[in-house]
Amino acid sequence: MNVTDYFDRARIINISSRKDRRVETVEEFARNGFPFDHDKVSFFKAVTPSEDDGFPSIGARGCFMSHLGILEEAIRLDVKNILILEDDIQFSRRISQYGQQAIESLQGMEWDIAYFGHPFEGDSSSPTWKAVDQPIHLSHFYAVNGKCITRL
């Protein structure tokens, strides 16, 4: 089972003006053997606000609103879980092996958010899940369990 197989939906945030990133993302999926099934795996049109409205930048607000939009969509669709990616995703060369291990471990545990894209500290030959109780500053590759979406 690959990483995308496990999730009800996978959404990739893409600014409509960045067609180059859209093409690169499709190629990245193909390189790693991930099917690009438009019912299950699809692009989400990034929110592009005109004002920062209290966020550090317009881009930060747009990023937040895009991720929030995907979570709201997941609630409407009543998904069991969702994988969220950004259009600059570059999978590890070990994604097949580590992705399968990650999915197998998720199937046997209670989880709310699984973050796949955080730099790993320590022995990267056998990655493990770590509980995190501090902010994570990147949001390019993570999953949310449907049972916790409304709490976010």
Regions found by a protein language model. Give the residues of each.
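An acidic/histidine-cluster motif and surrounding catalytic segment
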Residues: 1-85, 89-152
